[in-house]
Amino acid sequence: MKTAHWADFYAEKIKKEKGPKNLYTVASGITPSGTVHIGNFREVISVDLVARALRDSGSKVRFIYSWDNYDVFRKVPKNMPEQELLTTYLRQAITRVPDTRSHKTSYARANEIEFEKYLPVVGINPEFIDQSKQYTSNAYASQIKFALDHKKELSEALNEYRTSKLEENWYPISVFCTKCNRDTTTVNNYDNHYSVEYSCECGNQESLDIRTTWAIKLPWRIDWPMRWKYEKVDFEPAGKDHHSSGGSFDTSKNIVKIFQGSPPVTFQYDFISIKGRGGKISSSSGDVISLKDVLEVYTPEVTRFLFAATKPNTEFSISFDLDVIKIYEDYDKFERIYYGVEDVKEEKKRAFKRIYELSQPYMPSKRIPYQVGFRHLSVISQIFENNINKILNYLKNVQEDQKDKLINKINCAINWIRDFAPEDFKFSLRSKFDNMEILEENSKKAINELLDFLKKNFEVATEQDIQNEIYKISRENNIEPALFFKQIYKILIDKEKGPKLAGFIKIIGIDRFEKITSKYV
C-alpha cells in the first residue's frame, strides 16, 4: 500500500536499505556561524519527521544534531556589534569568538542556545553533539590518523570532482596554530605514526601529537563522511547545493567507503524564501528569519504544518503577509478532517490525517482544539485591544484544556497585526472625537434609525439581519449604501473601510456602538 506521507516513505526506505537494526541513527547539523535561520530548520524538521515515521513503525531511533562549531570564523556578520574586535578573530575556530551582544559566552554558543531553546517548542528534541569538544578531547584521534594514513585514496576521491587537482603536498587535515589560534598554517610533514609538523603565517613552527593535541581537525568534506561512519548514521538529508552533481554529497559517498562505512539514505531539500523578500536565506549577512521569528506569527503546530504539508524537494515561501490567514485556514481544515468534523474523499483523508498528526509537536489532543479563524481573531484582538481575558470571554464555550493552544493562537494574531498586517487591516475603535466630520441631516437620521433597530433587536438579530437593515435604512434616507458604509466605518474606526460591518457591530456590542455614534448624532 502507498505510504501516507513522504516521511513514511523514507522510513521504509531506510529499513529496506539498512536492514533490520536495534537502533537507527538519523542526523542533522549546522555550523553556528550566525543566526540559525528557518532555511536551516528545514533540515532539522525533515529529519524529525522521518525519525517520527520510523518510531511510528516500531523502530528505535537516535536523532543526533551536530554543532559544527570547530569550523573557521570566515566572515563577520553585519548585525554584530564591535565589528573591529570580531575581525581580530577571523580564521579562528568559531567556538573561540566572543559573543559581542551578551559578552556571556562564545559567539557560536550564543547562536546554539537560541536555536536549542525553541526546538522543544515545536516538539524536536535531538541529542546535540558539540564538535569542538569532540576534537579537543581527541575523540577523533584515530580517525585523523586513519585519514593521514589514507591520504592518497582521499586525494583521489576529492580530485574526481575537482577541476584543479590537489597538490602532491596536500594533507587531509587542517591545523589551528597553538600560538595565534588561526588556521593560517601549512602542514609540512607527517611521520606515519602520530606526529604532524606545521608552520604558521605568524612565524610559529612545531610538531603536534595527534593523540593529545586540540589543534588538528579534518576538513569538512572529509569530516562529514568520517562522522557517518563514526556515528553509524543511517539517514541524513542535505540541501540542493550539496546534492548537485559532483557536489559534497557525491564526494562524501566515496570518502565514507574509504573509512569502511556506507553512505546514509538521503534526500535533497530545497530552499525557503520569505514572502516578499525572495531569494535564498543566508546567515552571513545577519539579516535572517529564525525559528523564533516564525513562532511569533505561527503556532508550533502550524509551523510544523508548513513543512509536513510540503514535499522536501519543493521550494516554498514562508509568508508574513495576508497569506498567513490562508495558511491558518488550511491547517484548520486538516484539523477538522483529523477529528472527523469535516469529511473528504477517502484517498485524501489518510494523507490529510497523517500530515496533521506529524504537525503536532507532541501527541494530538484527545478532542479537537477550539477552532476560531485567524482572520476573526485578528479582528477581535483589535476590538478588545489585545486583552486576552476579554477575548476569551467573548469566545464562547472555551474549555480549560483548550485554553493554552488558543491563547498561543491569539498571541500570534496580535503579533501579526502589530508587525506584518497591511495598514488597511489595522484599526482601533475611536476613542477621540477631535477630528469629527459633520454629517448631513439625512445621515444623522439614518444613524439614529440604525441605533434604534440595534437597541430593539441586538440580541436576536443575525449578522445578515443587520446587513439588510443597513441597506434598507440607507435607501430610505436617499444615501448610497456604499457611502453609508463608509460613514459608519469613519465614525467607528476613522477609516473608510474595515472588517465586515454587520459582524463588526455584533462583536463591539450595542453599548460601545451607541457610545461612539452618539457623538455624531
Swiss-Prot record:
InterPro entries xrefs: aa-tRNA-synth_I_codon-bd_sub2, aa-tRNA-synth_I_CS, aa_tRNA-synth_I_cd-bd_sf, Lys-tRNA-ligase, Lys-tRNA-ligase_SC_fold, Rossmann-like_a/b/a_fold
Subcellular localization: Cytoplasm
GO molecular function, one term: ATP binding
Motif ('KMSKS' region): 280-284
Catalytic activity: tRNA(Lys) + L-lysine + ATP = L-lysyl-tRNA(Lys) + AMP + diphosphate
Gene3D superfamilies: 1.10.10.350, 1.10.10.770, HUPs, Lysine tRNA ligase, stem contact fold domain
UniProt protein name: Lysine--tRNA ligase
Highest classification ranks of the organism: Bacteria, Pseudomonadati, Spirochaetota, Spirochaetia, Spirochaetales
